[in-house]
C-alpha cells in the first residue's frame, strides 16, 4: 500500500496524471443499481457491458459519470468544457486537431491497475467524416444533435463479474495543490 501511495505522489510531482482506486465487495450492488445511484442529476453518464462470443455476458461492466471534460462538435465547431475549480471553455474551428489535443491531455500511465479504465467515452457520428475525407454530405441535420460528444469521466466504477468486486476509480490531475499526500488520503 505504501509503495502505491509513493508512486502516486511521485507521479503528481512529475506533473503526470494518476489514478486513485478503491476496491469494494460487489455482493449487494448491481451495475444497474449503481448507475441509478451515481447518475442522479447527471447530464452525462454511461453503462458499458462487455460481451464475449457475441451474446454471452462478459467479465466487466463499466459505469461513468460526472465528467472532468466534455468535448463536443456541433456545426463545424469543437468545444471543450473543463469542469475543474476554474471551469474553462475552449472553442476550435479545427475539430480533428481539437480531438488530437484532447487525446494528448487524457494520456496517463495506468501503472499496475489491471481493470479497464475508460478515458474517452462517447460517440463520433457519421458527419465527422467530413473533417477527415473530402466528402459531400447531402443529408441535412434534421434532429439537431451534436456530430460528436466524448467525455472524460471523473468517476469510473468497474464491476468485475469474475472476481465479484467493484473498483471505484478517479483520475487525479496535477494541480497547484502541493499537498499530494493529502490528495491521496482524501
Over which residues does each language-model region extend?
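Extended accessory regions or peripheral subdomains of proteins
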Residues: 1-45, 50-89, 126, 130-186
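Conserved short alpha-helical segments that host acidic/polar catalytic motifs at enzyme active sites
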Residues: 92-139
Amino acid at each position: 500500500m505504501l509503495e502505491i501511495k509513493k508512486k502516486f505522489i511521485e507521479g503528481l510531482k512529475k506533473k503526470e496524471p494518476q489514478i486513485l482506486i478503491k476496491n469494494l465487495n460487489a455482493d449487494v450492488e448491481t451495475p444497474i443499481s449503481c448507475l441509478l445511484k451515481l447518475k442522479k442529476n447527471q447530464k452525462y453518464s454511461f453503462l458499458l457491458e462487455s460481451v464475449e462470443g457475441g451474446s454471452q455476458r462478459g467479465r466487466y461492466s463499466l459505469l461513468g459519470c460526472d465528467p472532468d471534460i466534455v468535448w463536443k462538435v456541433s456545426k463545424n465547431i469543437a468545444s471543450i468544457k473543463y469542469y475543474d475549480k476554474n471551469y474553462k471553455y475552449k472553442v476550435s474551428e479545427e475539430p480533428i486537431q481539437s480531438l488530437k489535443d484532447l487525446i494528448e491531455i487524457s494520456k496517463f500511465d495506468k501503472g499496475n491497475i489491471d481493470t479497464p479504465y475508460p478515458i474517452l467515452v462517447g460517440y463520433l457520428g457519421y458527419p465527422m467524416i467530413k473533417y477527415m475525407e473530402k466528402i459531400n454530405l447531402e443529408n441535412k441535420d434534421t434532429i439537431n444533435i451534436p456530430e460528436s460528444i466524448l467525455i472524460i469521466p471523473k468517476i469510473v466504477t468497474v464491476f468485475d463479474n469474475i472476481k465479484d468486486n467493484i473498483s471505484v476509480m478517479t483520475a487525479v490531475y496535477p494541480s497547484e495543490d502541493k499537498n499530494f499526500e493529502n490528495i491521496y488520503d482524501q
